[in-house]
Amino acid sequence: VQMQTEVLDHLKKEAPELSFPNIVNANNGKSIIFINGFAIRLLTYLEGDLLTNIRRTPELYCDVGRFLGQFSQAMRSYSAPPNSDGSDKLWKLDEVLACKEYLPEVIDEDARDRIARLFDVYEKDIAPKLPSLRKAVIHGDANEQNFLINPDDPKKITGLIDVGEMQFGCQINDLAITLAYGLLGESDIKMASKAIISGYEKEFPIEDKERRILYYLMAMRLVTNIIMTSLAAKQQPDNEYILISQGPARALLKKLEQENYIQL
């Protein structure tokens, strides 16, 4: 929580054009107080509609990338404190191999086979490259449920919320995560991904070694989604919605292979 608070203060100074929740200090002037052993923090409310409720256009996709790229650039000047690795290892993209033990929980045989092959490629060709990538604190969950839109100007991102998954990691992960969620249900993934990446690079150019593995990292975020929802379905067998909601992730992962964004 302390790291998240510091990042929000940092963004207010380094990237005031980006709209994030602001910290409201308590009466004693502190940003975090403790009550009965619990850390309490108050954030301002951001107006706007969720991106998930808005019809997507190339211009909007590009602005998603623009906003995220400005965030990535701003985080280059922030020094991450120790122990800033995020709260849940299973959802941390740099630690995606931690999900592998739960692969048998994936019921769909086609998806399970594809994920197994993807894990093999990731372990052999992708994971060894991670230590050389640029690192900083990342948002960790920049998805369509957290980007905000002005309904009167639906081509522009007005804010980003939910900083609870902030963590220190490979900066390219933020773009991979946004692509993974932003392209769910999208029929033209070439148009959408090109627009998001273009907007991002106008603010924060991607290095060649990041570009070569970007779609694999995107795919691994989909893997995390599929495996974790499969595990949740086992723990909540009466909740039929859980497996229904993972359908778009399975479909997008399949499309990434079929259209040669990833080679398995």
Walk through the language-model features, giving the residues of each.
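Active-site acidic catalytic loop and adjacent metal/ATP-binding pocket
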Residues: 23, 123-172
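An alpha-helical support segment within catalytic cores of ATP-dependent transferases
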Residues: 80, 98-140, 150-152, 205
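A conserved alpha-helical element in kinase catalytic cores
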Residues: 1-38, 59-62
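Active-site activation/catalytic loop segments of kinase-like enzymes and analogous catalytic loops
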Residues: 171-205, 219-237
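A glycine-centered beta->alpha junction motif in the catalytic cores
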Residues: 40-54, 96-105, 224-239
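ATP/Mg2+ or Mg2+-diphosphate-binding catalytic cores
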Residues: 102, 225-264
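All-alpha amphipathic helical-bundle segments outside canonical DNA-binding/catalytic cores
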Residues: 59, 208-218
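A cross-family kinase active-site recognition segment
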Residues: 27, 54-110, 135
